[in-house]
């Protein structure tokens, strides 16, 4: 364990959660983000399929005496523990950077601006955490230093979310 801010991080738990949280992609493949984010209904359906396939895998492939352990390890790792919250933030940072990269390269697909917005909204929900405060204060501003198509819109979205709590204003 390590103290970060005023909280103790259990690095072993965080490592296990990080290692296993995308395990379900083994069953359905890594569906490209724009496809996953095409509609909320599709995202929900993909999650349901992943969950059912994971349960089936555990039931059919894992010896009975280890099924409870694997059910826990392969379940949703983004829980209310400190480590689950850190994983949620990291996952959204990954998505935010994916969207940023596509926008910076000039990809006109509006799904990337939506991904950027939704990622930042989720990250903002954890703004009581030291790592998020650091990201907002020191890292996020660097994203807007260069010139690229979509920069002004991204800045407006970030400003609205971080200062007003609503990107639609």
Label the predicted regions.
Residues 1-169:
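Alpha-helical, largely C-terminal catalytic domains
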